[in-house]
């Protein structure tokens, strides 16, 4: 694990979904880099973050470069996989069309996407989105390939013009506000289509994005195709839901156990109060209650710690309603744990 300065991140609103139910024992915790704290080994991640936001990184002898994807498309692909476990990668591509870069751009062709989704490795060509405005005699760029810096691109275009490597351009101007808008002004006699093709050829207005879908599987690096990435995500969510359900089941069983003790106390309220009052110490009162009513230590402790006024004022109807509701929850949670189809249904509903 890395030191904090390497792992700090500003979290957006969507990040809360990555941490959802983390306090319900849904994932394992491990010591942090200096063994002073515990940190999650992996996040519950209610949405498929690795595919949606992508990942880039290098290590000794390996690298990963997973492009970002459209959230809705990825979720549709996951749901389709849950509904049809035999779905092929080609069929998945009807849902997940390809990478969805935040800066836009146009992916040229689908062969690179298909290769990446099938083998885990591929290369795609991304072009800037540009329009030729003939009346104004200029090219307007509204989208750039992923990770291309607009200011550096404009500077480089001007350098190419100055060095005579690209002809037909008089100047560049940045008119961006909330939207990207880079203006490339042309000479009167320039052929805009030729200039644009030269810009694609000689500048970052056309870039190659090498896809390497490498991820850690059981702490081991592995190249994954699209179907494998989705399968591992579904399996992770199944594990998270099973662990969350077990946590909720334990909490409800503990609550039901307490309510059973309260029911006994209410049915024998006068004797219970007398036993508590006649006991010299709290441990003595607990022992007396456990011996007389076959209560557990947890039940006896809860009764003894309750103020006598509150104990005598407990309403049997409310306790009974709470108990019946809790038992229904327990039944439902046990049904989930006994049926994988119900678990997968919850995976789908959570998405």
PLM-predicted stretches and their roles:
Residues 2-9, 13-17, 22-25, 55-56, ...:
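C-terminal interaction appendages of subunits in large macromolecular complexes
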Residues 18-46:
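P-loop NTPase nucleotide-binding/switch module
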Residues 36-52, 57-60, 65:
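Long insertion/accessory domains within large nucleic-acid-processing enzymes
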């Amino acid at each position: 694990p890395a030191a904090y300065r390497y792992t700090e991140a500003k979290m957006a609103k969507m990040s809360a979904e990555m941490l959802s139910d983390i306090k319900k024992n849904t994932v394992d915790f491990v010591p942090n880099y200096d063994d002073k704290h515990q940190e999650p080994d992996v996040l519950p991640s209610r949405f498929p973050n690795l595919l949606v936001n992508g990942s880039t990184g290098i290590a000794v002898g390996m690298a990963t470069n997973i492009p970002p994807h459209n959230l809705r498309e990825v979720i549709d692909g996951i749901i389709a996989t849950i509904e049809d476990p035999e779905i092929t990668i080609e069929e998945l591509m009807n849902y997940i069309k390809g990478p969805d870069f935040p800066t836009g751009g146009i992916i040229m062709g689908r062969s690179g996407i298909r290769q990446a989704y099938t083998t885990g490795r591929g290369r795609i060509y991304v072009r800037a989105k540009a329009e030729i405005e003939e009346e104004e005699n200029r090219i307007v760029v509204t989208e750039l390939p992923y990770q291309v810096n607009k200011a550096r691109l404009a500077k480089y275009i001007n350098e190419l013009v100055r060095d005579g490597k690209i002809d037909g351009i008089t100047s560049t101007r940045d008119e961006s506000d909330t939207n990207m808008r880079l203006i490339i002004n042309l000479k009167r006699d320039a052929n805009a289509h030729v200039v644009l093709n030269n810009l694609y050829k000689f500048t970052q207005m056309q870039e190659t994005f090498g896809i390497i879908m490498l991820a850690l599987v059981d702490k081991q690096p592995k190249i994954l195709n699209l179907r494998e990435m989705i399968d591992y995500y579904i399996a992770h969510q199944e594990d998270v839901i099973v662990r969350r359900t077990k946590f909720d089941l334990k909490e409800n069983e503990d609550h039901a156990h307490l309510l059973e003790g309260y029911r006994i106390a209410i049915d024998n309220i006068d004797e219970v109060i007398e036993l508590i009052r006649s006991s010299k110490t709290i441990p003595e009162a607990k022992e007396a209650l456990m011996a007389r009513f076959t209560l557990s230590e947890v039940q006896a402790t809860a009764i003894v710690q309750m103020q006598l006024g509150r104990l005598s004022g407990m309403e049997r109807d409310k306790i009974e309603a709470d108990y019946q509701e809790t038992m229904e929850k327990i039944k439902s949670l046990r049904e989930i744990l006994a049926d994988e189809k119900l678990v997968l249904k919850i995976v789908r509903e959570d998405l």
